[in-house]
């Protein structure tokens, strides 16, 4: 929180004396797009049951062959925007790492 003003015209703490606002929680409107724990859990279960989409399998194959740029281009083409494609490629890299971890044990 901001420090209370001193009432003096100069210095780091200059300005009229004010009472600081105490806003406890963030607005609900700011939390849009954040997945709840329940939603994340349900999506995780669905991913386990259903598996990967064909384009996701192809992205993984490209990543395994060290063709990151091609994988990003494919994901961008399938998903529409560069940012979504980038996020999907990161997600697929996480899937590969998890598979390696499971395979090692």
From Swiss-Prot:
Residue runs in coiled coils: none
Subcellular location: Cytoplasm
GO biological process annotation, one example: cytoplasmic translation
Keywords: Cytoplasm, Ribonucleoprotein, Ribosomal protein
InterPro entries: Ribosomal_eL36 (IPR000509), Ribosomal_eL36_sf (IPR038097)
PROSITE patterns found in the cross-reference section: RIBOSOMAL_L36E (PS01190)
Region (Disordered): 1-36
Pfam families noted in UniProt: Ribosomal_L36e
Compositionally biased tracts (Basic residues): 27-36
Family: Belongs to the eukaryotic ribosomal protein eL36 family.
Known role: Component of the ribosome, a large ribonucleoprotein complex responsible for the synthesis of proteins in the cell. The small ribosomal subunit (SSU) binds messenger RNAs (mRNAs) and translates the encoded message by selecting cognate aminoacyl-transfer RNA (tRNA) molecules. The large subunit (LSU) contains the ribosomal catalytic site termed the peptidyl transferase center (PTC), which catalyzes the formation of peptide bonds, thereby polymerizing the amino acids delivered by tRNAs into a polypeptide chain.
Subunit structure: Component of the large ribosomal subunit (LSU).
Entry protein name: Large ribosomal subunit protein eL36
Native species: Emericella nidulans (strain FGSC A4 / ATCC 38163 / CBS 112.46 / NRRL 194 / M139) (Aspergillus nidulans)
């Amino acid at each position: 929180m901001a420090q209370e003003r001193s009432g003096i015209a100069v210095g780091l703490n200059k300005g009229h004396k004010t009472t600081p606002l105490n806003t406890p929680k963030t607005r609900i409107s700011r939390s849009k797009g954040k997945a709840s724990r329940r939603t994340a859990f349900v999506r995780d279960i669905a991913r386990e049951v259903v598996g990967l989409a064909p384009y996701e399998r192809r992205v993984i194959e490209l990543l395994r062959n060290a063709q990151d740029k091609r994988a990003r281009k494919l994901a961008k083409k399938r998903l529409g925007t560069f940012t979504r494609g980038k996020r999907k490629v990161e997600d697929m890299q996480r899937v590969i790492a998890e598979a390696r971890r499971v395979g090692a044990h």
